[in-house]
Amino acid sequence: KRGEIITFEAPSKSYFSAAEADLENPIAEYNYNINNVFSKFRYYVLEIGKESYIKRVIGLPGEHVKIENGKVYINGEELQEDYLEPTVETDSLNGPFTDIVVPENCVFVMGDNRAQSTDSRRFGCIPLEKIESTVWIRFWPLNLFGKVD
């Protein structure tokens, strides 16, 4: 359901944009653009080993998700995201998936750290069969240890 935090199998290389898919050598990419080396490295790690991501469900199957002017809209209505810090704005991250209808049997996910999150804005919707679990307790940081709402 919307607002739940889930874990899911991280997308493979094929999920990422065509511009990133052209990369063959992360070292050469480092020499070309040092600012993106860590995101490019993560991209290769995803292809090599199975990892899990943890994100919040934002859009459900059949819903129209749009990101505009720092806000998320579901079917034209602004999404109230009380779980975010008031200063957090949501931008497109120049991702291709910021105005879409969520396909059947998929969800649109986003991280709460919106400015740094690799999520559905970047790699698209997650098939329901890729969901591994629902998060219900937080261990870290210790000052936030407890049940996740």
Predicted regions and their residues:
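Extended hydrophobic leader/signal-anchor segments used for secretion and membrane insertion
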Residues: K1-D149
